[in-house]
């Protein structure tokens, strides 16, 4: 394990904590895409099915459990405790547009044609596009709260750091995971415009706004 991997995990965890604290303190899930959070819960579920069969390290096991629990707590807060504040009118991204191609690709491009491996591959592909409903929701409403933008920033930073992790591992171990790297690059690309707006607006105290779709 290297500093990029650890930093990426910390950034990922910070993003989730920021999101949960935002909802808990405001008693609202306004501005948060429940569909994106459902996809992330599905990502962690299908990726960590080996939780009780494969042991790599205590750190690895603990982080898996933390991400799983946080994902389902987030979904519960949105669709359960704070469901009255859920903005379903603007959270309208069609999930089948993501799930159908991701499922198909998981069967076509994987390292081993076994249930666990296909589900792991599915989770990697799905994570690369899981944020799209949230970005679509922001573009539809035209703006995002500062806390939501901080959440997205750390989520994007996590992916950038994981790309650095793969580069470092290739340099030091000659290890290359094509599926993870390509999916990570795709996911990072989705954040480029957001990173630019975050740096030029949010960090200067301005509200992030996006052009509304025609």
UniProtKB/Swiss-Prot annotation:
Q: How does it sit in the membrane?
A: Multi-pass membrane protein
Keyword Transport (UniProt):
yes
Query: Which ranges make up the Lumenal topological domains here?
Result: 1-4, 53-58, 111-116, 169-178
- Segments crossing the lipid bilayer: 5-24, 33-52, 59-79, 93-110, 117-135, 150-168, 179-199
Q: Name one GO biological process term.
A: protein retention in ER lumen
What are its GO cellular component terms? COPI-coated vesicle membrane; endoplasmic reticulum membrane; Golgi membrane
Q: Where is this region: Important for recycling of cargo proteins with the sequence motif K-D-E-L from the Golgi to the endoplasmic reticulum?
A: 204-207
* Annotated spans, Interaction with the K-D-E-L motif on target proteins: 47-48, 159-169
User: What's a Gene Ontology MF term here?
Assistant: KDEL sequence binding
- Record site: Interaction with the K-D-E-L motif on target proteins: 5, 117
Q: Does the keyword Protein transport apply?
A: yes
**Which InterPro entries does the record match to this protein?**
ER_ret_rcpt
- Give me the Cytoplasmic side stretches, as residue ranges: 25-32, 80-92, 136-149, 200-214
**Subcellular location per the Swiss-Prot or TrEMBL entry:** Endoplasmic reticulum membrane; Golgi apparatus membrane; Cytoplasmic vesicle, COPI-coated vesicle membrane
State its role.
Answer: Receptor for the C-terminal sequence motif K-D-E-L that is present on endoplasmic reticulum resident proteins and that mediates their recycling from the Golgi back to the endoplasmic reticulum.
Q: What is stated about domains?
A: Binds the C-terminal sequence motif K-D-E-L in a hydrophilic cavity between the transmembrane domains. This triggers a conformation change that exposes a Lys-rich patch on the cytosolic surface of the protein. This patch mediates recycling from the Golgi to the endoplasmic reticulum, probably via COPI vesicles.
- Write out the similarity annotation: Belongs to the ERD2 family.
The protein depicted here goes by the name ER lumen protein-retaining receptor 3
Gene it is expressed from: kdelr3
């Amino acid at each position: 394990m290297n500093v990029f991997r650890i930093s990426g995990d910390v950034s990922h965890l910070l993003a989730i904590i920021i999101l949960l604290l935002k909802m808990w303190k405001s008693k609202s899930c306004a501005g948060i895409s429940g569909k994106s959070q459902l996809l992330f819960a599905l990502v962690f579920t299908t990726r960590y099915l080996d939780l009780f069969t494969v042991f790599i390290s205590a750190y690895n096991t603990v982080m898996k459990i933390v991400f799983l629990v946080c994902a389902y707590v987030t979904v519960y807060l949105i669709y359960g405790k704070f469901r009255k504040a859920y903005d379903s009118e603007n959270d309208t991204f069609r999930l089948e547009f993501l799930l159908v191609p991701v499922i198909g690709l998981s069967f076509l491009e994987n390292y081993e044609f076994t249930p666990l491996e296909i589900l792991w591959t599915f989770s990697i592909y799905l994570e690369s596009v899981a944020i799209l409903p949230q970005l679509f929701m922001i573009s539809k409403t035209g703006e995002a709260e500062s806390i939501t933008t901080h959440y997205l920033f750390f989520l994007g930073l996590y992916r950038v750091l994981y790309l650095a992790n793969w580069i470092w591992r290739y340099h030091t171990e000659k290890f290359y995971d094509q599926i993870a790297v390509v999916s990570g690059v795709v996911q990072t690309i989705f954040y480029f415009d957001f990173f630019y707006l975050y740096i030029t607006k949010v960090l200067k105290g301005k509200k992030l706004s996006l052009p509304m779709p025609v």
